[in-house]
Swiss-Prot record:
It is a lipid-anchor; GPI-anchor. The keyword Glycoprotein applies. This is Ephrin-A5. InterPro entries: Cupredoxin (IPR008972), Ephrin (IPR031328), Ephrin-A_Ecto (IPR034252), Ephrin_CS (IPR019765), Ephrin_RBD (IPR001799). Cell surface GPI-bound ligand for Eph receptors, a family of receptor tyrosine kinases which are crucial for migration, repulsion and adhesion during neuronal, vascular and epithelial development. Binds promiscuously Eph receptors residing on adjacent cells, leading to contact-dependent bidirectional signaling into neighboring cells. Induces compartmentalized signaling within a caveolae-like membrane microdomain when bound to the extracellular domain of its cognate receptor. This signaling event requires the activity of the Fyn tyrosine kinase. Glycans are attached at residue 37. Residues 1-20 form the signal peptide. It comes from Gallus gallus (Chicken).
Length: 228
């Protein structure tokens, strides 16, 4: 019976090693807060972008106002995920699909918040699956009462797995990207720009790998247990 227990312990150790080698896996998920309104200076600069890792989150906060602000002075947006052409031309009609709608500027519970998890796989039929090393694009378009068209847009680059350092911790870390310095990792010229369509079943993930020395050590211990 002790041999069986030790065998199960060795198998469990191997399973932990495999889980730890999943691409882009981190002990702590980073959350990036984006305040979606025309007064955000990052949108005014015209090159609003963030770099994320798999399993990180994007939190979009809609415009919010006090009750004393008239409706015609508030901002409302419909946000779309688009491809690169839609991002460049700010065209959501034929280049993307609707993601969220900021339509409650006087919400009594504070600003509306929408979250996007950059995950490899999604259980939802209309969910979106993200791939490391690719760019994704969000835009919104609103037409104020004066007829002037405004466009806010955001570019998200999903870092390759080897550039996402593993961290230790149990709580999500929150970044306000409006105050954050410029990202240190820029997409390379051959970065793949993802099409703006929900992913369904495209499960082309990398195969987890275990370090050779660790695997050999565990196999040796397992053999010794069987001999005893």
């Amino acid at each position: 019976m002790p041999h069986v227990e030790m065998l199960l312990l060795a198998v469990a150790a191997l399973w932990v090693c495999v889980r730890g080698q999943e691409p882009g896996r981190k002990a702590v998920a980073d959350r990036y807060a984006v305040y979606w309104n025309s007064t955000n200076p990052r949108f005014q600069q015209g090159d609003y972008h963030i770099d994320v890792c798999i399993n990180d989150y994007l939190d979009v906060f809609c415009p919010h106002y006090e009750d004393s602000v008239p409706e015609d002075k508030t901002e409302r947006y419909v946000l779309y995920m688009v491809n690169f052409d839609g991002y460049s031309s700010c065209d959501h009609i034929s280049k993307g699909f609707k993601r969220w709608e900021c339509n409650r500027p006087h919400s009594p519970n504070g600003p509306l918040k929408f979250s996007e998890k950059f995950q490899l796989f999604t259980p939802f039929s209309l969910g979106f699956e993200f791939r490391p090393g690719r760019e994704y694009f969000y835009i919104s378009s609103a037409i104020p009462d004066n007829g002037r068209r405004s466009c806010l847009k955001l570019k998200v680059f999903v870092r390759p797995a080897n550039s996402c350092m593993k961290t230790i911790g149990v709580h999500d870390r929150v970044f306000d990207v409006n105050d954050k310095v410029e990202n240190s990792l820029e997409p390379a010229d051959d970065t793949v720009r993802e099409s703006a369509e929900p992913s369904r079943g495209e499960n082309a993930a990398q195969t987890p790998r275990i370090p050779i020395r660790l695997l050999a050590t565990l196999l040796f211990l397992l053999a010794m247990l069987l001999i005893l």
